[in-house]
Amino acid sequence: MISTIALFWALCVVCVVNMARYFSSLRALLVVLRGCDPLLYQYVDGGGFFTSHGQPSKQMRLVWYIYAQRYRDHHDDEFIRRCERVRRQFILTSALCGLVVVSLIALMIWH
């Protein structure tokens, strides 16, 4: 029988890998955004997005832009595809992180 702790750690590894994929896709989206829509790139603080001096309020603008699917009216097809990918990966990563938290609580209760 599979150990529940081993299963929990496997779930954590899957979650971390998906987080890395999400951040990589987000970085690629910002590169595409810089080329196709420089004003939006500045609006969401594209240059300082992954730095320690990045502005969280501007970063949240990109999150809400993607969450509300406002990118669907954009003129660049590559940008739309990248936004769709980032949105799907964000939903998947959020669900996996929630599952990790629920699993951790369950492990604390049953062990």
Curated annotation (Swiss-Prot):
Main subcellular localisation: membrane
Superkingdom field: Bacteria
Chain segments annotated as transmembrane: 1-21, 90-110
Topology versus the membrane: Multi-pass membrane protein
Residue ranges the record marks as coiled coil: none
Compartment(s) where it occurs, according to its Swiss-Prot or TrEMBL record: Cell inner membrane
Keywords: Cell inner membrane, Cell membrane, Membrane, Transmembrane, Transmembrane helix
GO cellular component, one term: plasma membrane
Any matching Pfam family: UspB
InterPro entries, A to Z: Universal_stress_protein_B (IPR019598)
Family annotation (NCBIfam families): PRK04960.1
Family: Belongs to the universal stress protein B family.
Name by which UniProt lists this protein: Universal stress protein B
Species the sequence originates in: Klebsiella pneumoniae subsp. pneumoniae (strain ATCC 700721 / MGH 78578)
